[in-house]
């Protein structure tokens, strides 16, 4: 939805964002995203960064961590949330989560717990 509003439905970057958001649990490669957008890797990276202010990998990581944060707030365990958004290692997920949010996933979940059915 965000991507369509920001870039229009036919935009290659918008399609890439939609693909990533629909497949957060799957491995993502820049080469695959560039091929889907019919661009070279360098052109895709440049256009993606112009459109989002983040590199494609930073954007994917941010989407995954944001989605996981909402799942944790909604009652998922840290492990469930990490696996659900494509992390194979809970420790790597926890390190990256803490880097982005300034606290561990457990601390964040305790401080941001949502009533059941909201997330």
Residue spans for each PLM region:
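Basic/polar phosphate-binding segments, predominantly the helix-turn-helix DNA-binding elements
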Residues: 2-3, 9, 19-21, 27-63, ...
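Short, basic, alpha-helical segments at the C-terminal edge of helix-turn-helix-like DNA-binding modules
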Residues: 60-69, 107-119
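A short, glycine-centered helix-capping/turn motif at helix boundaries
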Residues: 39, 75-76
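Short helix-to-turn junction characteristic of helix-turn-helix DNA-binding domains
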Residues: 20-23, 71-75
């Amino acid at each position: 939805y965000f991507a369509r509003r920001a870039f229009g439905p036919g935009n290659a970057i918008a399609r890439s964002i939609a693909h990533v958001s629909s497949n957060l649990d799957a491995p993502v490669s820049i080469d695959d995203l560039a091929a889907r957008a019919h661009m070279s890797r360098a052109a895709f990276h440049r256009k993606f960064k112009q459109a989002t202010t983040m590199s494609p990998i930073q954007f994917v990581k941010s989407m995954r961590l944001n989605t996981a944060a909402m799942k944790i707030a909604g009652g998922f365990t840290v492990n469930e949330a990490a696996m659900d958004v494509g992390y194979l290692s809970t420790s790597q997920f926890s390190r990256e989560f803490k880097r982005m949010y300034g606290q561990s996933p457990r601390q964040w979940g305790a401080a941001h717990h949502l009533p059941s059915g909201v997330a």
